[in-house]
Amino acid sequence: MANKYKIPQLPLSYDLETIAVLKQLNKANKKLAELKGVARTIPNENILISMLALQEARDSSAVENIVTTQDDLYQAGVSDNVRIINPATKEVLRYREAIFEGFEMVRKNKILSNNVIRKVQEKVKQNNAGFLVSPSKALVNQTDGRVIYTPPQDIDEVNEKMSNLERFINDQEMSNLDPLVKMAIIHHQFESIHPFGDGNGRTGRIVNILYLVITDLLDLPILYLSRYITHHKGEYYYLIQAIRDKNTDNAKEWEEWILFILKGVEETAGNTIELVKGISLLMAEYKNVLRPIFDKAYKHELINNLFFHPYTKIEYMQHDMMVQRKTAAKYLDRIVEAGLLEKVKKGRENYYINVKLCNLFLHYNELSEQKTDTIESIIK
């Protein structure tokens, strides 16, 4: 059973846009379109990319049992001592950098090539081994140690399957399937090819995000899909393997997998919409409080600083506001006095926490079934 799956050439021969898939597809596409519009209400796109990519990085890494805390991640951003950052946090931060790098490579020409995928994996794992084969890549059942699937062990097959996948991703004439259905197929195919020695899962989930960008379903890499996968981890791995176990007679299993991904897109997009609305409300609140306090010294860079850096420090404020260090320190102290930041001393360093913004992300699980008025109660 471990080796019988024959990775298919794409496109698949099945009619995968069944009635059930089309119904769920409509819901998912509507939510994505709404998210795309809501994201444009945040004036500085880098705030959303930075904040949401970090959450995606943390949850995608958690799928692989690489666990860190939000506090560790934010503290790493203000620490001058790289040596004290724990290994899990470093891995998550590398993942975020991989999202950034991948996004910059695809946003202009809208091509998600194998070279881009290699660069993403290189950033995730800090190596440039490229596509390879290895018996150690066999996937095992974590409970009993059985080998449940062995990816291709012939490098020519890996290269051929990745070339076919690259065409399927980028050649719109190769398949007229809806992009979200294609994304589900792409993700499964990549997981089965397993082209790298390590980092396949995380790289594959970044490919999902970048695919939404190259197909113009989103302008920014902000769909927070890994949280859904983390919450449904057992089902995620079960459905991936179910397609392999049925081998060629697996149209039903493909439909179930596609429905799972589409439901994830709908749920995740809905949650992210509410989160973006919460950030927008909070930014407006801070602006209303700080404008009269700073008067003529107020600049939009002030708000950008507080939301781009949930944990900020004097050097960041000095750089963003283009002021002297002493002035930057005074600015931060004023914001603390206004109740919008909390000052924390660690060793010889001071950093300043945007507590309301951090609370918004800490309460993110609660946003799943709540409306904007509830978000307002969380951020106040």
Language model segments and positions:
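FIC/Doc superfamily catalytic core
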Residues: 1-380
